[in-house]
Design a protein with these regions (language model features):
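Cationic, glycine-rich low-complexity segments
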Residues: 1-262, 298-309
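Membrane-insertive, amphipathic helical modules of secreted toxins and fusogens
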Residues: 302-345
């Protein structure tokens, strides 16, 4: 690939970045079509496409595939005698799945009652305190509800694109005058296949956040700091966990990292072996998510993971994570405001 062709590739990727979740949804739809056409409907969805829906009933919660129209959870009626029920997407945004029926079954006498959830995905059922109830969802997710889910990421997508364009404005002149033979990192080649390849490794960040002390080798002293945050500032850790479990948000971060790596000036990436790029891609996204809980944790993770590749690569990676910190902080603050407004309505 010539320098001019590489510049054109990055420009093309940036111009199409606002369509990132369209491609994601197309892949979801393609998977569902294959599953429906299959003799076996028990095909395991790739975790990359695993956007889930959630049913909350009292103090119980159950997650299921976005395509699952029939699933249940069991809970105990609280002392007040009112069982609160909520249906929503598993997302950093509490996007509701409303206007659907749920069946509430008293497990002692078998009496069944249908509760219609409102447009906010909420409803309640008068129950006998202390008795156990099964709450079963009986409604599919509509196309309009899926549209509302993905529309909620427009702000994050716009901020990431703006940041990438600002980065590219600094990188592009280096490509225009470079005589280096190294042409890009190659991570954008076969991009969807590359994304599937690294996805399960990226999801490791959930395990790190759930039990940081199990990852002292990867985090160093930051492991103890993360564990302390989980106790002293659970809200902060909750935000990081939400981001780590949100496939759409992680997908956008991964696409950002892929474009950014391929856009880096030739002299920045010349010393990076091609086989190392996939590993670096994984580490960039994990480091970015860890910064939400503790900025030092992201840097510590990258330092311990990348030290063997030299200070230059480490500096490049830390620069990426620090560059995204403000965007992700703003994003999570917007999520909090969104939830506060929704709860006040």
């Amino acid at each position: 690939m010539t320098h001019a062709a590489h510049i054109a590739l990055i420009d093309h990727e940036l111009d199409g970045f606002h369509q990132s979740l369209v491609m994601y949804r197309q892949q979801m739809a393609a998977w569902y079509s294959r599953a429906l056409d299959s003799v076996s409907h028990g095909l395991d969805m790739p975790s990359l496409l695993g956007m889930d829906r959630v049913l909350r009933a009292g103090d119980s919660q159950r997650s299921a595939s976005i395509s699952d129209a029939d699933f249940a959870t069991v809970t105990q009626c609280p002392m007040g005698g009112e069982l609160k029920i909520e249906s929503l997407f598993e997302s950093v945004y509490d996007v509701p799945i409303g206007n659907i029926p749920v069946e509430v079954i008293d497990l002692d006498d078998g009496i069944s009652t249908v509760v219609m959830l409102d447009e906010r995905g909420q409803g309640s059922h008068h129950c006998a305190a202390g008795r156990r109830y099964q709450v079963r969802v009986q409604g599919e997710v509509s196309e309009e509800q899926v549209e509302a889910l993905f529309a909620s990421y427009a702000g994050l997508m716009g901020d990431l694109e703006q940041w990438l364009r600002a980065q590219w404005s600094g990188f592009k002149p280096h490509w225009e005058r470079s005589t280096a033979s190294a042409i890009g990192s190659g991570v954008l080649a076969g991009s969807w296949a590359a994304i599937r390849e690294v996805w399960d490794s990226i999801k490791q960040v959930q395990a790190i956040l759930e039990a940081p002390l199990n990852y002292v080798e990867q985090l160093g002293a930051a492991a103890a700091e993360l564990a302390q945050i989980a106790t002293a500032a659970p809200k902060v850790m909750e935000q990081a966990m939400l981001l780590a479990s949100d496939e759409a948000a992680l997908y956008l971060l991964l696409r950002t990292a892929m474009i950014w790596l391929d856009a880096l000036p030739p002299d920045e990436i010349a010393e990076v072996a091609a086989g190392f790029m996939v590993s670096l891609l994984i580490d960039l996204v994990i480091g970015a998510v860890l910064t939400i809980a503790l900025p030092a944790a992201g840097v510590a993770y990258l330092s311990l993971r990348l030290v063997k590749y030299g200070s230059r690569i480490l500096d490049v990676a830390v620069g990426f994570v620090r560059g995204l910190l403000a965007i992700l902080t703003t994003f999570m603050q917007a999520v909090d405001r969104y939830k506060a407004v929704a709860q006040a309505d």
